[in-house]
């Protein structure tokens, strides 16, 4: 695994006006910075900066001679502030919106000497962050690749964020129950029927759809922190590249790259 590095921003100003000290953690894969074009990878809701290598969550596409070729590119991935991968959590996560994460990453990249990104790619909230960075800094990114995401939190997402927040604060098993509910957000009734079709797990005497959901609840609880989940869930509800700006179409007029939106 690439070593986890830190970058400090002594006085970081949030969109709300609050000024805080901030330390970001990140990993670099492939070519060293300044030796090759740079690809920024933004992780998803419960992901982290470990995107490549034996335990990398995106190692199928990031690595030597893979889609994002680490023999050609410098790949950098930051941890969202508060995601807990670096054992650091946000004490006041509700002060943050996704645009703050965008600005923090941009400041860090500037201070690391990265003058341009060949690409910014991410899925879920990571893709929404790529949207935000492209609009906030339109001449900084040559290719924007948001995957399975939207440029604003829809009413469906906002409703689910509310329910997730209530589960995280009120449930006796908050991580497990929030993840079980989230799994339904990632699937449709048709996809569940196609995969399970009311089949039974005879060993557990449960429907396979039930054991699948319980498995994912337990799995997340074993590797993720509830404070990180609360922070990331809050940021999910703050997605909006048009916040304090004009319309979506106007925002795109000032964006130099052509976004390549990818749906799952």
Describe each PLM feature range:
Residues 1-38:
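Catalytic-loop region of hydrolases
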Residues 27-84:
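N-terminal cap/lid subdomain of alpha/beta-hydrolase-fold enzymes
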Residues 69-72, 77-103, 162-165:
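Cap/lid segment of the alpha/beta-hydrolase catalytic domain
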Residues 100-117:
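Conserved acidic catalytic loop of the alpha/beta-hydrolase fold
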Residues 140-219:
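Alpha/beta-hydrolase-fold enzymes
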Residues 231-250:
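Active-site nucleophile elbow and catalytic-triad environment of alpha/beta-hydrolase enzymes
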Residues 254-264:
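Single conserved hydrophobic/aromatic residue that forms the stacking wall/gate
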């Amino acid at each position: 695994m690439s070593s986890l590095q830190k970058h400090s921003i002594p006085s970081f100003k949030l969109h709300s006006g609050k000024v805080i000290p901030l330390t970001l953690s990140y990993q670099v894969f492939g070519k060293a910075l300044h030796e090759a074009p740079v690809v920024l990878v933004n992780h998803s809701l419960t992901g982290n900066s470990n995107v490549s290598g034996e335990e990398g969550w995106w190692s199928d596409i990031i690595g030597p001679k893979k889609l994002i070729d680490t023999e050609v590119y410098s790949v950098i991935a930051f941890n969202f502030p508060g995601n807990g991968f670096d054992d650091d959590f946000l004490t006041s996560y509700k002060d943050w919106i996704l645009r703050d994460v965008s600005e923090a990453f941009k400041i860090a990249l500037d201070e690391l000497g990265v003058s341009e990104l060949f690409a910014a790619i991410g899925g879920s909230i990571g893709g929404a962050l790529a949207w935000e960075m492209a609009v906030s800094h339109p001449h900084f990114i040559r290719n924007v690749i948001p995957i399975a995401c939207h440029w604003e939190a829809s009413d469906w997402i906002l409703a689910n964020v509310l329910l997730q927040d209530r589960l995280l604060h009120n449930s006796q098993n908050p991580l497990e129950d929030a993840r079980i509910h989230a799994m339904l957000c990632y699937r449709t009734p048709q996809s569940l029927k196609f995969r399970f079709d009311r089949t039974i797990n005879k060993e557990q005497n449960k429907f396979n759809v039930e054991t699948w959901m319980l498995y994912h609840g337990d799995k997340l609880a074993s590797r993720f922190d509830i404070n990180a989940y609360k922070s990331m869930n809050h940021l999910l509800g703050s997605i909006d590249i048009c916040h304090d700006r004009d319309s979506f179409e106007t925002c795109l007029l000032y964006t130099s790259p052509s976004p390549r939106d990818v749906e799952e």
